[in-house]
């Protein structure tokens, strides 16, 4: 009996199995949204959930709690893993930061340029230039994990590092180009929460409850500031101490405790809530519009070309080195996966075009097709053409 339980636990904690579950939830969301349960699906996502303390009230749809709340925990975990790499891993050398930073920059500039070239002359459609610049880290990482031992672990760290810069870029784009109102008061409160965590860290305090309270205050203030709340998860991670005063692995303990919830609750729920695009309303005739073509070219072509080109240049001119144990073929495979814009691209699409059906949902279809093509081609390439010998 114990042997069976052990095997089940091993399967459940297997990252590749988690990736499969993520894809299943994506397909399930598409089926539900386009089936007889579509109304219940929308009611579930629009259900208001909230709380109030005195005059303060936070009452938002369930979808927001998933996208801005639960997914912040995902970015918190990414931040924890990156901190380990910065302090004890490859990124202890500042030179190793150059590659993911430049890769992310290429993954923003080239897709935006392609979209702009296709839609030049139309001021309204050009508002969507940032749609193909995004990468859905959760899905890209899930596909990468499904490749198993075919690629070195250093490429996983490269993708995570690239994703941080990519997300920061997306947040800056949203804040500068798609945010109409920013709250200075909320920024001040966020600064106080960050200062409190810095003091806790410097004093070597490892009470989880203290960091939890500060992180909640930070999350709420970032949410109210007008900036995407997921940034709070990344910031919080950087202030978690590596170990207790007794030398126990504090950060590692927190990271390990999150693995199960991330792989089998948070990320599947995130996929189910965001992948439900209504395909019945899509006008096939609009599929070949400038917006759709720009999005597809930006995500499927622009992302992989931009990320790989900028990566190759900094490696070629010796400003950076390839991730340890990898080669250019494997690096290119990871670059393909950055074209999975999916939920983040859908999010920016909603900000860029306030009228959701202005293009008869062809823009949403373009995001789905480009993301699926990037995921499928990236998986096939990494699994069969770039396998480690």
From Swiss-Prot:
Keyword Transport among record annotations: yes
Pfam families per the UniProt record, alphabetical: Na_H_antiport_1 (PF06965)
The entry's keywords: Antiport, Cell inner membrane, Cell membrane, Ion transport, Membrane, Sodium, Sodium transport, Transmembrane, Transmembrane helix, Transport
One GO term describing the cellular component: plasma membrane
Reaction equation(s) it catalyzes: Na(+)(in) + 2 H(+)(out) = Na(+)(out) + 2 H(+)(in)
BP terms from Gene Ontology: regulation of pH
Subcellular location: Cell inner membrane
Family membership: Belongs to the NhaA Na(+)/H(+) (TC 2.A.33) antiporter family.
Protein name: Na(+)/H(+) antiporter NhaA 1
């Amino acid at each position: 009996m114990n042997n069976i339980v052990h095997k089940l636990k091993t399967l459940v904690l297997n990252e590749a199995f988690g990736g499969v579950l993520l894809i299943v939830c994506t397909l399930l969301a598409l089926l539900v949204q386009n089936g007889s349960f579509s109304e219940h699906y929308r009611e579930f996502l629009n259900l208001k959930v909230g709380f109030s303390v005195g005059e303060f009230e936070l009452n938002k749809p369930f979808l927001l709690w998933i996208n801005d709340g639960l997914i912040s925990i995902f970015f918190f975990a990414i931040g924890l893993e990156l901190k380990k790499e910065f302090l004890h891993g490859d990124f202890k050398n500042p030179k190793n930061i150059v590659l993911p930073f430049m890769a992310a920059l290429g993954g923003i500039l080239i897709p935006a340029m392609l979209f702009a070239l296709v839609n030049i002359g139309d001021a309204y459609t050009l508002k969507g230039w940032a749609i193909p610049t995004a990468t859905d880290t959760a899905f890209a990482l899930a596909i990468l994990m499904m490749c198993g031992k075919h690629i070195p672990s250093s490429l996983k760290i490269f993708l995570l590092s690239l994703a941080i810069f990519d997300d920061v870029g997306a947040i800056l784009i949203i804040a500068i180009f798609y945010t109409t109102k920013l709250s200075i008061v909320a920024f001040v409160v966020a600064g106080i929460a960050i200062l409190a965590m810095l003091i806790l860290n410097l004093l070597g305090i490892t009470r989880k409850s203290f960091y939890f309270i500060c992180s909640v205050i930070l999350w709420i203030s970032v949410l109210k500031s007008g900036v995407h709340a997921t940034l709070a998860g990344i910031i919080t991670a950087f202030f978690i101490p590596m170990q207790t005063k007794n030398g126990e692995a504090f950060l590692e303990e927190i990271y390990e405790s999150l693995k199960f919830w991330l792989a089998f609750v948070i990320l599947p729920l995130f996929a189910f809530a965001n992948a439900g695009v209504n395909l019945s309303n899509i006008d096939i005739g609009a599929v070949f519009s400038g917006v759709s073509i720009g999005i597809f070219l930006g995500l499927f072509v622009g992302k992989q070309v931009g990320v790989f080109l900028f990566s190759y240049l900094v490696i070629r001119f010796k400003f950076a080195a390839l991730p340890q144990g990898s080669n250019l073929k494997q690096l290119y495979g990871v670059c393909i996966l950055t074209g999975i814009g999916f939920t983040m691209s859908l999010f920016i699409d909603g900000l860029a075009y306030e009228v959701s059906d202005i293009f008869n949902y062809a823009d949403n279809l373009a995001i789905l097709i480009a993301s699926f093509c990037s995921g499928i081609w990236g998986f096939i390439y990494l699994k069969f053409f770039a396998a480690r010998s």
